[in-house]
Amino acid sequence: MPRLTPLPRDAFDFAAARHLLVRAGFGGTPGMVQGLLSRGLDGAVDWLVDFEGESASGPDRNIQADTFDPRVKMQLTAADYESYRKAREAGDEEAIAAFRRKQEQQERDDRGAMRSFEQWWLSRMIETPRPLEEKLTLFWHGHFAASYTTVENSWHMFRQNQFFRKHAAGNFGDLLHGIIEDPAMLRFLDNNRNRKGSPNENLAREIMELFSLGEPELLGRKRSPYREPDIKEGARALTGYTYRDNAFFFDEGQHDNGLKRILGRSGRWNGHDFVDMLLGHRSCSEFIAWKIYRAFVNDVPETPPSDEVRNVVVQLGKVLKGNKYNLKKTLGELFRSAHFYAASNRAAHIKSPVELVVGSVRDLGVPVRNIDTLRTAAARLGQRLCHPPSVKGWDGGRAWINTSTMFLRQNTAVWMLTGRDAGGHPWPKDTTPFDPMPLVEQLERQGEVDPDEATVYLQRLLLACPVEEARSQAIRQVFTLANDRVNADSLTAALCVLTALPEYQLC
């Protein structure tokens, strides 16, 4: 079985434990990092990847019964359309207006349900005792990207989210097979219009290009592993894959059962045969390894990547393929590897907006204050949950940062720390008290905290890399202005300075 070179066990220190908790989750308080460190490398990795052992508490309780109703956005029935047609033929303006009012109210209700779902998911990421489960759910949402803007059905988006969560660290094959039966994806890529004799190529194209085999230039390949005829034949294999009444439906009458030639193999292939062929191609495991690498190890702005990175990705792909696409085993191998903890891979990932707001709550221990404000902040920063900009998902990396988003990131952190709006945004003032002193409680000596120690410790705790001396002194200056006292007010002010640093945007 292929292996990545493991990290020496004695090299798993506080900084390594923090790196693991941030990358495989959304970070945490000093106590959480110390708890992970106390488990040792193997125990820490096992705890993260074997998350089923932790109870799913928090906002997950009764979510289906209390928050979402599949009837909010039911598809209009044939009877509804027939009634509408008759009303139009008869010129019954009252019936037509009633039909439209019902439709508009249904759409408003569904948009409200979608907002509730976004709030729920953000809350779950903040509160979850299973950080890797939610990190992977977010990862698969970006990989198999579908947007509510097109789907226009909150229940379908919710069910897709639950599907990603169910298989988060399971088997990639189950994810790929399941996505061709997912109503949200079928609607998003128009496969509900993919019929015998009139194939729609959208799903077939994206399942090859974005979901399984990838584009050739990503890993420096000389040629694509598939060609246009493969896409066309794959589309035929997916004919009849649609949905009815909020569930997948295989319309046998609209399925093309003729002979098809895909990736050099001929047969009367259906959609799942098509998926099996993709999973069997060597490019698939490498491409998924590449996506995992970019999400969990290093953003890698250069394309194609360096020889070193490519070698690690190829090896990780072999681990994935050797484990028959078992994600838990593959991630465990990655999180134990020396490469994952290498200095070149620390502070090598720009926090996404969701990672920023969720991670700040978990790292700093600030109150949530207003979950919809956090949702709105992430959206303004470029990442609204369930609204990726395209089927490619979010570009990530350096695309997250520009002059305006950097300013908004800084102001978001100030609001989270103080409840006050520093940037002129219509965010609600929040007076929920925040006591930052637990962050430095282990530095306390005879009831006081040394400001020099606090300055160094905060950087060690919250930053993934050292900062210039001038920036460190800017943090220290806050305590100087407070007569060298480290208390709730001065510590909060110091955190406002620290979270405004460019280095805070990295993990």
What are the residue ranges of the model-derived segments?
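Short, compositionally biased low-complexity segments
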Residues: 15-23, 109-111, 199-202, 206, ...
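N-terminal accessory alpha/beta regions
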Residues: 28-143, 147-167
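Hydrophobic residues in alpha-helical segments
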Residues: 36-37, 48-49, 88, 126, ...
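Active-site substrate-binding loop specific to GH73 endo-beta-N-acetylglucosaminidase modules
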Residues: 2-3, 85-91, 95-103, 114-121, ...
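Aromatic-acidic/polar surface patches that form glycan- and anion
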Residues: 10, 111, 129, 224, ...
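Flexible, low-complexity segments enriched for small/polar residues
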Residues: 2-13, 18-30, 51, 71, ...
